Amino acid sequence: MKKTKILIPIYNDWQSVFKLLETINVQLDSWEADISVIIINDASTEERPNNTCLLNNLKSVHVINMRENRGHARCNATGLKYIFEKEDFDYVIIMDGDGEDRPAEL
């Protein structure tokens, strides 16, 4: 089975990210896939809420916290570097955390 990593940069919009994760999870309901999500937190000033949504179709969700706000492109670069150095994967998909990239297009 092919391993896919979804990279999502985030700054302060945790509600949108949780909604996106739930939508991705539903989208994967009929798939047989090995999909993990890596969220890059760009030094958000808002506290991350405790979300207990069930994401049973995702293998894992990992959050990497940046020490200082560096912007969207730096978050993507940091996430890609992490994936290439630490993860076993076949595909990488970068998605915006605000829902601009539709999970239906996965």
Question: Model features per residue range: what roles?
Answer:
Residues 3-5, 36:
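Cell-envelope/extracellular polymer assembly enzymes that use nucleotide-activated donors
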Residues 13-28, 47:
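Short, well-formed alpha-helical segments that are part of the catalytic scaffolds
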Residues 24, 79, 98:
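Residue-level signature of catalytic and energy-coupling elements of molecular machines
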Residues 33-44, 65-66:
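Short beta-strand/loop segment that forms part of the nucleotide-sugar
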Residues 41-51, 99:
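A conserved acidic beta->alpha catalytic loop
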Residues 48-49, 76, 104-106:
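Acidic donor-diphosphate engagement hotspot in glycosyltransferases and nucleotidyltransferases
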Residues 52-86, 91:
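Conserved donor nucleotide-binding strand/loop of the catalytic core
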Residues 88-100:
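Short beta-strand-to-loop acidic/aromatic patch adjacent to the donor-nucleotide binding site
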